[in-house]
């Protein structure tokens, strides 16, 4: 088979199963409204859960820092790209989340891959929730360690997998809030089981940080859990982008030596780091608390209204509210029907989710108003098949 035939066959297979992904060009994609092709839509696809991407205080912090530092970092943090803004943000994050150290990464994907790639060796074992993010599972598959996946949120299955003999070290991998199902992991029980088997715990709290817990400290704080490795990302609740790994002093020093994604990548712009510090200040403030409370009320309003419809609603109380449709074609038709009525929603299909569980991944944000939720419910009820 030629290279071109391989490419063509893969694309043909995606088209045949209605799983071909596409991008939409938008003029505005975060916040309450999405603008595409000159039309305005209520935006139910954004991860900007607290509406901070449009916050004037955060925008101003970025602008002022860009004037001071320029628009790029100029290199890896190991060469010349570790500025006072980066150091300040790392120290603020570590203090906020109660860890000795925080290390910044350019994305959550890079952070997850870096940690697993650097830590895991031959004869080690990774035991991951089967619905863990692609960045975690891909890194686990590519590492020399054995990967075993436990049934989603099934702590008994997790315990059985950890009990089987392992010559090396074991790492348990889970998420705080799951990106496609919107539900939360039983973190306290998972941590208890991991410690009983002398395993370390890695929690990716991309969708919980900033949004849940006291001062927005995330799902781990909310559940009274402190994993050995906590990954937080800044493209959701923080409204910016990037990520950080929270860990011990020695693990941070280890990652600085052996995490290739960190060593060989240009660091985030200092202006971005300063904007993230401004975002953190908002998240920790009374305003941040009010934003979280408003979001929680909107989620409750949506769930109370959609229960009367004909869609399958998962047990999710986060900003992520997936409606399971099942069939790929039906999910695409439903997303298009909502867009025709002025509501922008995204159809998620395999391989992102398991076969037969195609869905609308609806996300609610603090930028929405109660009338927006009511409009979404009205359109959903009218579009049900």
Curated annotation (Swiss-Prot):
Cofactor(s) for this UniProt protein: pyridoxal 5'-phosphate
Native species: Salmonella paratyphi C (strain RKS4594)
CDD domains to which the protein is assigned, alphabetical: KBL_like
Protein's pathway: Cofactor biosynthesis; biotin biosynthesis
Modified residues (N6-(pyridoxal phosphate)lysine): 236
UniProt xrefs under InterPro entries: Aminotrans_II_pyridoxalP_BS, Aminotransferase_I/II_large, AON_synthase_class-II, AONS_Archaea/Proteobacteria, AONS_Proteobacteria, PyrdxlP-dep_Trfase, PyrdxlP-dep_Trfase_major, PyrdxlP-dep_Trfase_small
UniProt keyword list: Biotin biosynthesis, Pyridoxal phosphate, Transferase
Gene3D superfamilies: Aspartate Aminotransferase, domain 1, Type I PLP-dependent aspartate aminotransferase-like (Major domain)
Name listed for the protein in its UniProt record: 8-amino-7-oxononanoate synthase
Function, as annotated: Catalyzes the decarboxylative condensation of pimeloyl-[acyl-carrier protein] and L-alanine to produce 8-amino-7-oxononanoate (AON), [acyl-carrier protein], and carbon dioxide.
Subunit structure of this chain's protein: Homodimer.
UniProt-annotated binding residues for substrate: 21, 133, 352
EC number from the UniProt entry: 2.3.1.47
Taxonomic lineage from the root: Bacteria, Pseudomonadati, Pseudomonadota, Gammaproteobacteria, Enterobacterales
Recorded family membership: Belongs to the class-II pyridoxal-phosphate-dependent aminotransferase family. BioF subfamily.
Binding of pyridoxal 5'-phosphate, residues: 108-109, 179, 207, 233
């Amino acid at each position: 088979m030629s290279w071109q035939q391989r490419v063509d066959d893969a694309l043909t297979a995606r088209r045949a199963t209605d799983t071909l992904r596409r991008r939409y060009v938008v003029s505005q994609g975060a916040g309450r409204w999405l603008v595409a092709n000159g039309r305005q839509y209520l935006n139910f696809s954004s991860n900007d859960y607290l509406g901070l991407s449009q916050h004037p205080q955060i925008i101003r912090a970025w602008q002022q820092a860009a004037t001071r530092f320029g628009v790029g970092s100029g290199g890896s943090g190991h060469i010349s790209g570790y500025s006072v803004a980066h150091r300040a943000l790392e120290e603020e994050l570590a203090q906020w989340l109660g860890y000795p150290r925080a290390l910044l990464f350019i994305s959550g994907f890079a952070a997850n891959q870096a940690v697993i790639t650097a830590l895991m060796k031959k004869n080690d074992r990774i035991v991951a929730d089967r619905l863990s993010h692609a960045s975690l599972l891909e890194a686990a598959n590519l590492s020399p360690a054995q990967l075993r996946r436990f049934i989603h949120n099934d702590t008994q299955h997790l315990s059985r997998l950890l009990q089987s003999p392992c010559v090396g070290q074991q790492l348990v991998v889970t998420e705080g809030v799951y990106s496609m199902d919107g539900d939360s992991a039983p973190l306290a029980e998972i941590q208890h089981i991991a410690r009983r088997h002398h395993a370390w715990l890695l929690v990716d709290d991309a969708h919980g940080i900033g949004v849940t817990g006291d001062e927005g400290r995330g799902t781990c704080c909310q559940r009274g859990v402190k994993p050995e490795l906590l990954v937080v990302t800044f493209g959701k609740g923080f409204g910016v982008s990037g990520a950080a790994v929270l860990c011990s002093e020695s693990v941070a020093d280890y990652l600085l030596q052996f995490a290739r994604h960190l060593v060989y990548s240009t660091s985030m712009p200092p202006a971005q780091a300063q904007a993230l510090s401004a975002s953190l200040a908002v998240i920790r403030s009374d305003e941040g608390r009010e934003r979280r409370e408003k979001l929680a009320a909107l989620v409750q309003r949506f769930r109370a209204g959609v229960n009367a419809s004909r869609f399958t609603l998962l047990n999710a109380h986060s900003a992520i509210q997936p409606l399971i449709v099942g069939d790929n074609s039906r999910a695409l038709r439903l997303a298009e029907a909502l867009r025709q009525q002025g509501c922008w929603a995204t159809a998620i299909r395999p391989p992102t989710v398991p076969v037969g569980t195609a869905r609308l991944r609806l996300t609610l944000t603090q930028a929405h108003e109660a009338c927006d939720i009511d409009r979404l419910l009205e359109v959903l009820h009218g579009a049900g098949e």
